[in-house]
């Protein structure tokens, strides 16, 4: 999953950091669907693999953009994607505080940016599929956008069910999420099967039994 997260981050940034080619709204719709499926079958590994690149993407697309309509809508779609995945994570892990945060600070400004994937024919169609690119649209600018990263990290790290299934404590999760992540970091994580390391605290924290509706135990914690 670390490798997939790195590829998704690079794809999301194509056209922003790399102007030779650009991702499309369809790419974001499909990435959102893929992450949704992963979080259903591997919620713990999915959080560990995808949260660091999400936080990196949030920071990289927080600056204002006014110069180019395509860049404006690409930037806004990146911000929508970050919020959409955090909403999925919060639903899976029943983290209501993050859902409330997104409802107040995220949805009112970015709900219109949700991309859609093209409908595919039930039968084989040899004609090329028209994939729309970023261009002019609803917005003329992408104003500066500040995510409350410390709050998001604190809320996820304090989730007792996540601590239990990841076999670490809140301090360990905070250290994992606070890392300076890059796509290259994700590839190294994949090569080394990296995961959070238990960090002792001065005040021991008992890992209480997870809520009855928490994600089921996963057969493997390998997040490569």
Which functions belong to the PLM regions below?
Residues 1-224:
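Alpha-solenoid helical-repeat scaffold
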């Amino acid at each position: 999953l670390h490798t997939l997260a790195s590829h998704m981050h690079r794809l999301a940034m194509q056209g922003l950091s790399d102007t030779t080619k650009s991702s499309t709204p369809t790419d974001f719709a499909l990435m959102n669907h893929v992450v949704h499926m992963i979080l259903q079958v591997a919620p713990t590994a999915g959080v560990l693999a995808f949260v660091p690149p999400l936080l990196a993407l949030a920071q990289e697309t927080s600056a204002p953009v006014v110069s180019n309509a395509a860049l404006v809508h690409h930037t806004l779609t990146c911000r929508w994607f970050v919020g959409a995945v955090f909403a999925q994570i919060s639903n899976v892990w029943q983290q209501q505080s993050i859902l409330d945060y997104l409802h107040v600070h995220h949805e009112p400004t970015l709900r219109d940016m949700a991309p859609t994937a093209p409908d595919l024919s039930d039968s084989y169609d040899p004609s090329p599929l028209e994939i729309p690119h970023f261009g002019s649209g609803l917005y003329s600018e992408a104003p500066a956008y500040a995510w409350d990263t410390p709050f998001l990290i604190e809320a996820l790290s304090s989730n007792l069910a996540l601590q239990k299934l990841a076999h670490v404590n809140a301090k360990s999760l905070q250290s994992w999420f606070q890392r300076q992540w890059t796509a290259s970091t994700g590839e190294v994580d994949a090569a080394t099967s990296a995961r959070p390391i238990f960090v002792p605290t001065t005040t021991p924290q008992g890992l209480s039994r997870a809520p009855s509706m928490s994600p089921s135990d996963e057969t493997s914690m390998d997040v490569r």
